[in-house]
Regions:
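N-terminal Rossmann-like FAD-binding beta1-loop-alpha1 element of flavoenzymes
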Residues: 7-33
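Glycine-rich FAD pyrophosphate-binding loop
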Residues: 26-46
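Central helical "cap/lid" subdomain
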Residues: 42, 191-236
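Helix-loop-beta segment of a Rossmann-like dinucleotide-binding subdomain
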Residues: 83-92, 118-122, 126-164, 265-270, ...
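Helical element adjacent to the flavin cofactor pocket in flavoenzyme catalytic cores
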Residues: 140-195
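Active-site lid/adjacent beta-loop-alpha segment flanking the redox-cofactor pocket in flavoenzymes
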Residues: 230-326
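C-terminal catalytic lobe of FAD-dependent flavoproteins
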Residues: 290-370
Length: 370
């Protein structure tokens, strides 16, 4: 499509954060265009595992992730569309003495942050999840752990944004020039003037920031995921994570299981090329089957890798850029799917002159200019 000559706000990046930011702006009656270098909802948000859990998140960020789950529930209601959101709780498992000690310590830390957990071992664990391997010696259950369908979520957000009057366009950002009243953006689809720019480019945040003369270091991850054929429901719609990390597992309502957790593939974000590392893929599958043996009976349909990124301090980068009126950043640093709707609402509010929520203060992009 042809870009308009000018608009109030341009959101760069059509993932979970960019689209929710734009949706809130459009529903508030603001002019907004979302641009992306490729088809919308193609990269990180589209190729992740759909996990919206608390138990596998960093303790110091738990308050923000808890609010992220609140926003997911609001999103379900506000979209009035099927996004495959399931909230049946989740298990974080331990398989060794070291795991169990870490699980107890982690549960204590999370409980101190207000997360409600139930400790399970012995018969209580077998009764709750008979499908877990006998090597799983203990688990904590969190009723807030959830998941959603990345495919359905993206489709619903794009539909809702367009219905609200927003625009989504394939247009890669290639440069910018500051103006008295905003910015002139150069893109692969032409030039567009705007008052506000929201950078919601995920793994490409460092590249976009550099166009504005800002250095935001980003560590690229190339996460491996797999999906099985549809099999009979046996996991009670729970999310499973592992105290040792690099493990997420869930069974969607259609019966297919999604295996994730962060085993690494290979890729280069500038060329866009990415590929599976077969050793890492096999390690991921063995790990999953060691926790849930029934997975061995399912055929693997497809495996893939997707880009995600982490800031050098493993903190979100969210809010207005000091000294640069009209420039905002919305970078979640890992687990963006979980916290995305919260960040989107917060950044949209900031664009409209509202203060950033207390839970996100301290994560502004100004810390990189210090």
């Amino acid at each position: 499509m042809t870009l308009p000559a000018g608009v109030e706000t341009v959101v760069v990046g059509a993932g979970i954060i960019g689209l929710t930011t734009a949706l809130h702006l459009a529903r508030a009656g603001r002019e907004v265009v979302v641009i992306d270098k490729a088809e919308p909802w193609r990269e990180g948000s589209a190729v992740n595992a759909g996990t919206c859990a608390l138990q596998n998140k960093a303790t110091d960020l738990l308050p923000a992730y808890r609010h992220g789950l609140v926003e997911w529930r609001r999103l379900v209601s506000e979209l009035d569309d099927d996004i495959g959101f399931v909230n049946r709780g989740g298990l974080r498992v331990a398989q060794s003495a070291e795991d169990m000690a870490a699980l107890r310590a982690g549960a204590a830390d999370q409980a101190a942050q207000g997360v409600q957990l139930e400790w399970l071992d012995g018969n209580a664990l077998r009764d709750r999840a008979p499908w877990l391997s006998p090597t799983v010696t203990a688990a904590t259950f969190c009723g807030d752990d959830s998941f959603a369908s990345p495919l359905l979520t993206g489709q619903a957000l794009i539909r809702a944004l367009r219905l609200a009057g927003g625009t989504v366009a394939v247009a890669g950002l290639t440069g910018q020039r500051a103006r008295d009243d905003g910015y002139e953006l150069t893109t692969t689809a032409g030039v567009i003037d705007c008052r506000n720019v929201v950078i919601a480019t995920g793994a490409w945040t460092d590249r976009a920031a550099a166009m504005f003369g800002i250095d935001i270091p980003v560590l690229l991850h190339v996460n491996t995921l797999s999906v099985t054929e549809r099999i009979g429901q046996f996991m009670d719609n729970m999310v499973v994570t592992h105290i040792a990390g690099k493990f997420t597992l869930k069974q969607f309502p259609n019966g297919s299981c999604i295996l994730g957790g962060g085993f690494q593939g290979r890729g280069d974000k500038d060329s866009g090329k990415k590929e599976l590392d077969l050793d890492q893929l096999q390690a991921n599958i063995r790990y999953q089957c060691s926790v849930v043996p029934q997975l061995r009976e399912a055929n693997l349909l497809r495996s893939w890798v997707g880009f995600t990124a982490i800031a050098h301090d493993n903190k979100p980068t969210v809010g207005p850029m000091p000294g640069r009126p009209g420039l905002y950043f919305a970078f979640s640093t890992n687990a963006g799917f979980s916290i995305g709707p919260f960040v989107g609402r917060a950044v949209a509010g900031a664009v409209m002159g509202q203060p950033m929520p207390d839970l996100l203060r301290g994560f502004g992009p100004g810390r990189f200019a210090a």
